[in-house]
Structures are given as C-alpha cells and as structure tokens.
Curated annotation (Swiss-Prot):
Protein role: Promotes tail assembly by creating a scaffold for the tail tube proteins. Tail assembly proteins G and GT probably wrap the linear tape measure protein to create a tail assembly scaffold. This allows the polymerization of the tail tube protein, during which G and GT are released, therefore they are absent in the mature virion. The tail assembly protein GT is produced by a rare -1 ribosomal frameshift. The ratio of translated G/GT is about 20, and this ratio is important for proper tail assembly.
Example of a GO cellular component annotation carried by this entry: host cell cytoplasm
Main location group: host cell
Compartmental location: Host cytoplasm
Region of interest (Disordered), ranges: 121-140
UniProt entry keywords in alphabetical sequence: Host cytoplasm, Late protein, Viral release from host cell, Viral tail assembly
Assembly and interaction partners: Interacts with the tail assembly protein GT and the tape measure protein.
GO terms for biological process, alphabetical: viral tail assembly; viral translational frameshifting
Family indicated by similarity: Belongs to the lambda-like tail assembly protein family.
UniProt name for this protein: Tail assembly protein G
Keyword Cell inner membrane: no
UniProt cross-references to Pfam families, sorted A to Z: Phage_TAC_2
Length: 140
C-alpha cells in the first residue's frame, strides 16, 4: 500500500520487489544480530558464502511476499516467507539473489546497515587495494 516497488528482471523473468515493511526490517535486523552473536560466541564460526546466500534469499522472500500468491494462502506471514525463501533458494541463481537483495536494500533505504563504514579516502590517499573473495596467502 505505502511501500515502494520495482520490477526486477533476470534471464527474461520479471518479478516485483517491494520495500520491506517496518516489521520485516525488524525481523531482518534480528537475523543479522543473531548471526553476529553466533560469530562472536564461536570464534571458529565465520560468515560463510552459504550464510550470505541464505540471508539474501530471506530478504528477497520478505520483499516478494507483498505481491506473491502465497501471501493469502498461508496462515501467517512467517510461514509464507519461509516457503517463498525455499522457492528462491531452489529456483534462483545466486547472482539473481544478490542483485535482488541489493534492489531491496535500496528500496528500503537500508544501505547504511550493510555498507562498510570505513572513512572516505581523500584524493591524496592513492588507489585503494583491490578487493578479492579469495584467501590471502604468502607465496614463497
């Protein structure tokens, strides 16, 4: 009703993504907090690629719920979102999940929760180091 929406297209398929409602934002932030607490309590626990994909699928599912047929077929929003999340995980490629997740963050004005808060570089600072998903290692 009041939420912003945007069409999202991937491989010729278009869906409507919605801004997260206030309740959904709270649920998403609670998930992020639980993940951070788990990482702190277990020093060996790292935020994995699987965690990133599942978190993205959950966020996308919450966004899709607003215009999804499951919205009226399930007794609760949480049950419907879980089912939509499974649909996203089983039918969407990871690239689409990631791109859709970014759209939802933008629609919801939530980039401040996921953007690195590192100080901005000045022009004199020189080029930034390249970002790599691989492990750092020394070559001998």
């Amino acid at each position: 009703m009041f939420l912003k929406t945007e069409s999202f297209e991937h491989n010729g398929v278009t869906v409507t993504l919605s801004e997260l409602s206030a309740l959904q934002r709270i649920e998403h932030l609670a998930l992020m907090k639980r993940q951070a607490e788990q990482a702190e309590s277990d020093s060996n626990r790292k935020f994995t690629v699987e965690d990133a994909i599942r978190t993205g699928a959950f966020l996308v599912a919450m966004s899709l719920w607003h215009n999804h047929p499951q919205k009226t077929q399930m007794p609760s929003m949480n049950e419907a979102v879980k089912q939509i999340e499974q649909e996203v995980l089983t039918t969407w490629p990871t690239e689409a999940i990631s791109h859709a997740e970014n759209v939802v963050y933008r629609l919801s004005g939530m980039y401040e929760f996921v953007v690195n808060n590192a100080p901005e570089q000045t022009e004199d600072a020189g080029p930034a180091e390249p970002v790599s998903a691989g492990k750092c290692s020394t070559v001998s």
